[in-house]
């Protein structure tokens, strides 16, 4: 059985009609907000320049924002980018953060590349809900500090007292970062004193 159109080329993928599912944005489990802070003014109160930049809840919005705006290599000196759950401010005083702390990874080698990679891997892990203890995580902060030559990422938690949860978060984050460096946990109410190291 032969047909007349056997040798006709198939339509290119761009010519095929998209299904309804392909047209729909890919929703995330929860909404997230990017924040920006530039602490370059001496004597300014902490948080005086902190601004919410954008809230999103789809994979497509995340990639558009990350690719055009929110990359650590685009930060100026003493600036910070934050990604926090929508409704949570990246401040110790926020009720979601007040009884928590933060895991911190200090980046000293290949700083720009390492910080960019660690930032992106952490963002994808957060919005992709890769942490078993995702409800205990508030967000992440990327800080650029050229004077001290120590850029850093800090993963903020809701708890400071549940050691099992904190160690689970710390170990998973270190696995996500794929680093041998130590990461340290500090309470928000006493961020000068290290509590855990993995």
Curated annotation (Swiss-Prot):
Positions carrying N-acetylalanine: 2
Summary of the tissues where the protein is detected: Abundant in floral organs and in young developing tissues.
UniProt keywords, alphabetically: Acetylation, Disulfide bond, Initiation factor, Protein biosynthesis, RNA-binding, Translation regulation
Region ranges (Disordered): 1-25
Positions bound to mRNA: 46-47, 92-93, 145-152
One GO cellular component, as annotated: plastid
GO molecular function: RNA 7-methylguanosine cap binding; translation initiation factor activity
Bias-annotated ranges (Low complexity): 8-19
Disulphide-bridged cysteine pairs: 97-138
Function summary: Recognizes and binds the 7-methylguanosine-containing mRNA cap during an early step in the initiation of protein synthesis and facilitates ribosome binding by inducing the unwinding of the mRNAs secondary structures. Mediates susceptibility to Turnipmosaic potyvirus (TuMV) and Tobacco etch potyvirus (TEV).
Family, similarity comment: Belongs to the eukaryotic initiation factor 4E family.
Subunit structure: EIF4F is a multi-subunit complex, the composition of which varies with external and internal environmental conditions. It is composed of at least EIF4A, EIF4E and EIF4G. EIF4E is also known to interact with other partners. In higher plants two isoforms of EIF4F have been identified, named isoform EIF4F and isoform EIF(iso)4F. Isoform EIF4F has subunits p220 and p26, whereas isoform EIF(iso)4F has subunits p82 and p28. This isoform interacts with the viral protein genome linked (VPg)-proteinase of turnip mosaic potyvirus. Interacts directly with LOX2. Interacts with BTF3.
Listed GO biological process terms: negative regulation of defense response to virus; regulation of translation; response to virus
Signal peptide: none
Lineage, broadest ranks: Eukaryota, Viridiplantae, Streptophyta, Embryophyta, Tracheophyta
PTMs per UniProt: According to the redox status, the Cys-97-Cys-138 disulfide bridge may have a role in regulating protein function by affecting its ability to bind capped mRNA.
Free-text disruption phenotype from the record: Decreased susceptibility to TuMV and TEV.
One Pfam entry name: IF4E
UniProt name for this protein: Eukaryotic translation initiation factor isoform 4E
